[in-house]
């Protein structure tokens, strides 16, 4: 069994304490066992739909889907894949907002298992620590690689960064298109959903909140 990093353990514990962890049930299956089980179920689904798995275009589809689920689009369910995070002392005494905009985000709606596609915007005001900029992108992508609802995803990213940076002064905004709305049901191809989660001074200080929201429009 792969041991988890200190950062992964801290973040998981924080999410569990706040009731923000993705609904999970522990099982003893390793990655290979999960892939084999999913492949068998996917094969049964395709056969139920009447698809010919003897066709060379479809024969490997159950295997591809199983591998994609475990190794890629749902890899964020496994904290062993939590990114290696570099947090360093704020020696330059930076005390103004740092913002990373337009972080590409692809997730999966947990209600219909179809795509959520959008952009995340992250800001924080350093206290004692700063984080490598690319690590923010990786943390966003880690939590996106799960079955998700956008509201929880936004809050998970917020709490993870608050935990790692040792400050409440973090703000997150996500704007995304949901294919459960675009490709089925109401079939609305133009709407999108925006969620925001604010902590610390971004929540309590109107000027700081306004600075963050203005930064989203630039």
From Swiss-Prot:
Q: Which residues bind Zn(2+)?
A: 109, 112, 180
Gene3D superfamilies, per database record: 1.10.286.10, 3.30.1130.10
Please give the InterPro entries that the UniProt record associates with this protein. Answer: GTP-CH-I_C/QueF, GTP-CH-I_N, GTP_CycHdrlase_I, GTP_CycHdrlase_I_CS, GTP_CycHdrlase_I_dom
Q: What is its EC number?
A: 3.5.4.16
Q: Name one Pfam family in it.
A: GTP_cyclohydroI
| Gene Ontology BP annotations | one-carbon metabolic process; tetrahydrobiopterin biosynthetic process; tetrahydrofolate biosynthetic process
User: Pathway, per Swiss-Prot/TrEMBL?
Assistant: Cofactor biosynthesis; 7,8-dihydroneopterin triphosphate biosynthesis; 7,8-dihydroneopterin triphosphate from GTP: step 1/1
Instruction: Write out the catalysed reaction.
Output: GTP + H2O = 7,8-dihydroneopterin 3'-triphosphate + formate + H(+)
An example GO CC term for this entry is: cytoplasm
Q: Name one GO molecular function term.
A: GTP cyclohydrolase I activity
* Assigned keywords, A-Z: GTP-binding, Hydrolase, Metal-binding, Nucleotide-binding, One-carbon metabolism, Zinc
Family assignment?
Belongs to the GTP cyclohydrolase I family.
Q: How does it assemble?
A: Toroid-shaped homodecamer, composed of two pentamers of five dimers.
Q: What is this protein called?
A: GTP cyclohydrolase 1
Q: Which organism is it from?
A: Aeromonas hydrophila subsp. hydrophila (strain ATCC 7966 / DSM 30187 / BCRC 13018 / CCUG 14551 / JCM 1027 / KCTC 2358 / NCIMB 9240 / NCTC 8049)
């Amino acid at each position: 069994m792969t041991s988890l990093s200190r950062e992964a353990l801290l973040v998981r514990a924080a999410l569990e304490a706040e009731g923000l962890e993705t609904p999970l049930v522990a099982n003893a299956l390793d990655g290979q066992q999960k892939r084999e089980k999913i492949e068998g179920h996917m094969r049964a689904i395709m056969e139920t739909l009447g698809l010919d798995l003897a066709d060379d275009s479809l024969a490997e589809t159950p295997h591809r889907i199983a591998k994609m689920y475990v190794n890629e689009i749902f890899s964020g369910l496994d904290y062993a894949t939590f990114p290696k995070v570099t947090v360093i002392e704020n020696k330059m005494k930076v005390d103004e907002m740092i913002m990373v905009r337009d972080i590409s985000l692809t997730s999966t709606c947990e209600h219909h298992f179809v795509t959520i596609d959008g952009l995340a915007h992250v800001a924080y005001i350093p206290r004692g620590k700063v984080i490598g900029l690319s690590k923010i992108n990786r943390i966003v992508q880690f939590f996106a690689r799960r079955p998700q609802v956008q509201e929880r995803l936004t809050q998970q990213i917020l709490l993870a960064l608050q935990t790692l940076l040792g400050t409440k002064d973090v703000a997150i905004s996500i704007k995304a298109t949901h294919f459960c709305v675009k490709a089925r049901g109401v079939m609305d191809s133009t709407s999108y959903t925006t969620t925001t989660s604010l902590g610390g001074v971004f929540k309590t200080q109107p000027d700081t909140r306004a600075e963050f929201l203005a930064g989203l429009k630039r």
